[in-house]
Regions:
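P-loop NTP-binding module
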Residues: 1-224
């Protein structure tokens, strides 16, 4: 495919000491923990060779399973791949957390675009030095299901697909909200993050049944 040309975005320099320590792709890039995310990146790149895999939802059954941490680490690793342009979207609009984890301050985000108060270009931030781009969540909202299900989100996804090779979508918990299912149906693939020793097997099974099999990339076991 032809190389994608990106517009100029606001840039933010990431400082390792300000980010969430579990973002090992940033804080411990040479550790064995980070190696697990390299393996996950390899899995995604390998799958991409045989099927369209551009927009990927990272979801969990319940809150606090590590899906946002997994999404950022994966996106950071993809962005460091030669020639790959990657965007991560915070679509967990009831509790947006990606900007806080990364130690960045944002004024606009996905909720503002959905509300029609800013453009996609104005809300995306380029994170140096990894070349990862982020579309933060913006202001927390309660009418998320309606916004995510509407035509505006489809437009946003179409627009960012034209700009980036990979779009990683941090979704709300699947076991609680319907938004994640809507997101998965608009994406090309999904992975489920499960916290070891915490998530009930029955809950995971129930959630997996709600994900179309052809979109399921696998289950990520979070040991932290």
């Amino acid at each position: 495919p032809a190389e994608k040309t990106l517009p100029e975005f606001t840039e933010w320099e990431i400082e390792a000491e300000r980010v969430e320590p579990r973002l090992v792709a940033i804080t411990q890039p040479h550790s064995t923990y980070c190696e697990e995310y390299r393996s996950l990146r390899t899995h995604v790149l390998h799958k991409s060779q045989t099927k369209k895999l551009q927009a990927i939802v990272v979801a969990s059954t319940n809150p606090s399973e590590g899906k946002s941490i997994t999404a950022i680490n994966l996106a950071w690793m993809l962005a460091q791949t030669d020639g790959v342009k990657c965007l991560i979207i915070d679509s967990d609009l009831r509790m947006p957390s990606l900007a806080d984890y990364l130690g960045i301050e944002t004024e606009k985000g996905l909720s503002d675009i959905l509300a029609g108060t800013c453009s996609v270009k104005d809300a995306i931030i380029k994170l140096a030095p990894a070349n990862l781009h982020i579309l933060p969540g913006g202001e927390a909202r309660s009418d998320v299901a309606e916004l995510i299900s509407g035509p505006k989100f489809k437009e946003i996804l179409r627009e960012v697909r034209d700009m980036f090779d990979y779009v990683i979508i941090d979704a709300p918990p699947l076991g609680i909200f319907t938004d994640a299912t809507v997101l998965i149906n608009q994406a090309d693939g999904a992975m489920l993050v499960v916290r070891a020793g915490r998530t009930r097997y029955s809950a995971v099974t129930r959630v997996l049944e709600s994900i179309p099999r052809e979109r399921m990339l696998g289950v990520v076991l979070n040991q932290s």
